[in-house]
Amino acid sequence: MDELGSRNPSIGLESIGFSDLSVVRYNFEAAQLYEEALARGEAELTAHGALCARTGQHTGRSPKDKYVVRDANTADQIWWDNNSAISPEHFEVLRRDMLAHAKGMSLYVQDLVGGADPENALPTRVVTEFAWHSLFIRNLLIRPEREALPSFQPKLTIIDLPSFKADPVRHGCRSETVIACDLTNGLVLIGGTSYAGEMKKSVFTVLNYLLPEKSVMPMHCSANVGPAGDTAIFFGLSGTGKTTLSADPNRTLIGDDEHGWSEKGVFNFEGGCYAKAIRLSEAAEPEIFATTRRFGTVMENVVLDERRLPDFDDGSLTENTRCAYPLHFIPNASKTGTAPQPRTIIMLTADAFGVLPPIAKLTPEQAMYHFLSGYTAKVAGTEKGVTEPEATFSTCFGAPFMPRHPSEYGNLLKDLIARNGVTCWLVNTGWTGGAFGTGSRMPIKVTRALLSAALDGSLNNASFRTDANFGFAVPVSVPGVEAGILDPRSTWADGVAYDTQARRLVDMFIANFAKFERHVDGSVRDAAPGARVAAE
C-alpha cells in the first residue's frame, strides 16, 4: 500500500481496519484533487475553473436511510421517534463488509475540524472513494494548519464508499443506501449514495449529539455580526430567506448553515458554504455567483453546455443543484468563524397562509415555542394545479439532524436567551394581503427595513400591540414602512376570511405542539397561539 501526503504517521487507515489498499492520498489540496478527479472521470472542469460532478440516482439526502446505533450509551439519549435505530451487531457487520469492499481501492483522506471554537471542536477524519468528495469536504469543514497534521488525532471518522451497496437483510437497513452513525465510537459509514451533503450533515448530527452535554447549543442557522460586535442568528427552513437575509454587505458573515452557542459566544461549525445553485444569478446573489467562477469550487448536479458553461436555470438533473466553496471565497466572511454573544435572534417563516405579521417580538417562552414548532408554509404541487398552502413543521428548524429530543435544545435555547438578554423576532417573508393565490409575496424591501430596525435596536422603542390570535407583540409603526402592512388583517379584503384562516393556522400550531406538551413547563405551554385569547 502506497501512502502519499502529510499525516500523523502513527494513525494510518490500518488503525481502523483497512487492509490491502492500493494507494492512500492524505490531505491532498485542490489542484491535486482536481487532477485525480479529472483523470478518474469523476468530474468535469468548467469554463471558469470550478469542478462539476454528478451524483447519479441520489441528488439529495436520504433521511429514511439514516441510522443511529442503539447501544447502552444512546438508548436513553436519542429521540427515537425521529431517528431510526441500527443494532451494534448489524453495524459491525456493515463495517466489516465496507472494509472488505475497499480492498484494492485507492482512497482519499482529509483530516479536518468541525467547530471553530477550539474548546468545542471535533477533529474529523473523512475517508472517501471519490477525489471530488475529498475536495468537497475539504471545502466545507475547517482545515487545520499544515504543521498540525503530523499530530492530528481524530475523534470522528467518516467512511464514504458510494460503490458499496448495503444488504437490507444482512445489515439491518431499508435499502442499498445506508448512512449509519455509531455515536459511542465516533464512526459514520456511508454507502450507496454519491450525494456529498451526507458527509456534511453527518458531522452536524454528531455535534448536535455531543455539544448539549457541555451546555453548548448546536443550531441549524446562519449568523452574522455588525461593526459594534452585535451578533445576529437567523433560524429558518428552506425557502424562508435565511441565506439571502444574513448576507449583508454591512455585516460580517460568520456562516450560512451550522453554528454553536456557548458561554463565550457563537462559532461556526464549518469552514465553507453549500449554497443552492438553481436559478442562481449574478444580479440577485453576486457573491455566491462569483464563487462558481473560481478554482476550487465544487458544483454538484449543475448542467454544463458544450462549452462547459453552467446553466443554473436547468433543473433537469435536480432542483437541488449546489455549489460548495470555502468561506473565504465570500468577501465579508469572518476569518475566525467566531463572534460575541448574540444580541438578536431572527426566526424566519414564509407563511403562505398570509396571516402572520411581517415582524413580531417574542418573549423567551414564545421563542422556545416557535423554535420547537419550526413552522413555515410552502405551496405544494402548483405545477399540478394545487394551490392550497401546506404547513410544514420541522422542530428546531432542522428535525432530520437532531438526534436528541427537541426539548433538550429548546431548554438550552431558552436559558441562553434569558441569560444573555437576547431580543427575539419572528419575521414572515411569506404572503401579505391574502393567502397564496390571492395575496402577494412580502416585499423584500419591507423585510430588509424591518430587519435593519431590529438589528440596530431601534425597533425595541416602537409601540406594540398584542396579536389577538398568536399573542406576540407586533409593532404599530416603523419608520420607512407603511403602517398598514404591519397589521395583516387590514391587508385582507375580507376581515372575516382572515379570522378564519388565522384560526386554522392557530389550530395547526396547537395540533403539532401536542407531542411536546409534557416536555415543556407551563410558561412555554402558555406561550402557545390562542392560549392568551382563551385565558381572556
From Swiss-Prot:
Q: Which positions bind substrate?
A: 61, 195, 201, 322
Protein's cellular compartments: Cytoplasm
Q: What class of enzyme is it?
A: lyase
For activity, the cofactor(s) needed are: Mn(2+)
Q: Name one GO biological process term.
A: gluconeogenesis
Does the record bear Ligase in its keywords? no
What keywords appear on the UniProt entry?
ATP-binding, Cytoplasm, Decarboxylase, Gluconeogenesis, Lyase, Manganese, Metal-binding, Nucleotide-binding
| Cofactor binding: number and manner | Binds 1 Mn(2+) ion per subunit.
What residues bind ATP, as annotated? 201, 220, 236-244, 285, 322, 447
This protein's pathway? Carbohydrate biosynthesis; gluconeogenesis
Q: Name the Pfam families for this protein.
A: PEPCK_ATP
Q: Which domain of life is it from?
A: Bacteria
- PROSITE patterns listed in its UniProt record: PEPCK_ATP
Residues bound to Mn(2+) are: 201, 220, 257
Q: Name one GO cellular component term.
A: cytosol
Reaction catalysis annotation = oxaloacetate + ATP = phosphoenolpyruvate + ADP + CO2
E.C. code = 4.1.1.49
Q: Drop me one GO molecular function for this one.
A: ATP binding
The entry assigns this protein to a family as follows: Belongs to the phosphoenolpyruvate carboxykinase (ATP) family.
**Function statement:** Involved in the gluconeogenesis. Catalyzes the conversion of oxaloacetate (OAA) to phosphoenolpyruvate (PEP) through direct phosphoryl transfer between the nucleoside triphosphate and OAA.
Query: What is the recorded name of this protein?
Result: Phosphoenolpyruvate carboxykinase (ATP)
Q: In the record, what lineage is assigned to the organism producing the protein? A: Bacteria, Pseudomonadati, Pseudomonadota, Alphaproteobacteria, Hyphomicrobiales
Gene symbol here is: pckA
